[in-house]
Amino acid sequence: MAITYLKKSPKTSSTDDTKTTGIVQDLLKNIETTKEQGCIDLTKKFDKYDGEIIVSKERIEEIKKTLDQKTKDDVQFSYERVRKFAEAQLKNYGQDFEVELSDGLFAGQKLIPVNTAGCYVPGGRYAHIASAVMSVTTAKVAGVKNVIACSPPKEGVGAHPTIIYTADLCGADVILNLGGVPAIAAMTNGLFNNPPADIIVGPGNQFVAEAKRILFGKVGIDLFAGPTEIGIIADAKADPEIVAVDLVGQAEHGYNSPCWLYTTSKELAEKVMKRVPELIAELPEVPRTNADAAWRDYGEVILCDTDEEMATISDEYAPEHLEVQTENLEWFHKRLTNYGSLFIGEETTVAYGDKCSGTNHILPTKGAGRYTGGLFVGKFVKTLSFQRMTKESTELVGAAAARISRYEGMEAHARTGDVRLKKYGYSS
C-alpha cells in the first residue's frame, strides 16, 4: 500500500538549528567568563526580572499560604501518580510492567531494542579487537536486529583481519572498511545500502568523538568519549611495582591519556614516580612515545591524609577506569560513587576489563562518570511508557488535566480533557 501525505510540513524541527547553535554558543561563552553576574544580566535582558535568583524558604512558605487550595489539590493529584509510576519503574527496572495508578488508570513500560546499531571499532594506532567484542556482542544480546561494524582499513588490506573475524563472530550483520569521520557519517546516513543507524557506539580518536558529538540528535550515541583515563587509589599496603605498571599500561594508549595516582603514602608515591619512567623506557617505540608524553603532560600523583580524602578527590575526577589497591577494599567499594569501571584489589587490572574479563570497556571519560555509566545492553534498548484508562477514570484525570493546563495557559490542552468529559457525561 502506497503512503500518501494529505498534508506535509514545509519545515522540520531542525530548520532553525544553525541559527540557534550560534546564539547558544555565544551565550555559553559569555556565562563561562562572567559567571553568576552573566546569568543575572541575561535574565534581566531576556526575562525582564531583576529579583533574587535563589528562591528563599520564606518565598516558598508565602506561596504555600496564598495559593488556592484547588490548585494545590490538582498538583498533589499529579504528583501522587507520577511518583507512583516512578516507584514502579524503579522496582521493575529493566523489565516490562503495567501498574494501576488509580481506579481505571493503568500505566506501564515496554523495553524495545533499537532496530539498527552502528559499532565503531578503532584500528589506527592499535588493532582494537576487544572493541568489536564489547560493542557488537552487547548490541546483539540487547536484541538489535541489524548491527553494522566499521573499522579503519589499511592500504591494500582493508580492516584488520582479526577485527573482521571478531565482528563476524560476535554477530555483526554488515562490516565496512571505513574509519574516522566517513565511518560515522556512513552509519548515520544509511550509506552503502544500509539503514541509518539509530545509535552509534564505540571508542575512537578525537575526530571520531567530534563527529559523534556533532551528529548527536540525528543519531543516538553511547557517550561523549575523550582520551582514556586511569585513576589508582593506593595506600602503604599497595605494591609500587604493580601500581607503576598499571599506570603505564593505560598511558600507552595515547599522548593525551591522563594517569592519576591518589595515595596516603609518600613513600609509595616516590617509588612509583621513580619507576614509571623506567618502565616507559623499556617499551617498544610507539607505546613508549605515547606513554612518555601522557605521563609527562597528563600524569598526576596526589598525596592525601586519609582514605576519605582519596575517595573524595577520586570522585571529583570520576576516572574512566579506577583501581583500588588498599587495605580496606570493601570500604572503598561502598564509598566511591563516580567512575566508569571499578577494579577492586591488585589481583585485577584495567587490561583485564579492556580485553576479556567480561565488563565493558566503552566507558565515560572527562568526568562523565558523575552522571553516566559505560556501554551496557540498556544503551541499545528504549524504555517506552504507555497508558490506558477507562471512561470512568476520566472524571478525575480529565478534570485535573484540564485545570492544570489552564493554570499553565495552555487552553488547547485543556480542551482535550473537556471534550472527553463532555462525551462521557462528566462536568469539567
Swiss-Prot record:
SUPFAM superfamilies associated with the record: ALDH-like
Disulfide bonds: none
This protein's UniProt keywords: Metal-binding, Oxidoreductase, Zinc
Any single GO CC term annotated in Swiss-Prot or TrEMBL for this entry: cytosol
GO terms (BP aspect): L-histidine biosynthetic process
UniProt cross-references to InterPro entries, sorted A to Z: Ald_DH/histidinol_DH (IPR016161), Histidinol_DH_CS (IPR001692), Histidinol_DH_monofunct (IPR022695), Hstdl_DH (IPR012131)
One function term, GO molecular function aspect: metal ion binding
Enzyme Commission code: 1.1.-.-
Cofactor details (free text): Binds 1 zinc ion per subunit.
Cofactor entry: Zn(2+)
Active site: E320 (proton acceptor), H321 (proton acceptor)
PROSITE patterns, alphabetized: HISOL_DEHYDROGENASE
Binding-site residues for Zn(2+), renumbered to this chain: Q250, H253, D354, H413
Family designation: Belongs to the histidinol dehydrogenase family.
Name of the molecule in the record: Histidinol dehydrogenase homolog
Species name: Pelagibacter ubique (strain HTCC1062)
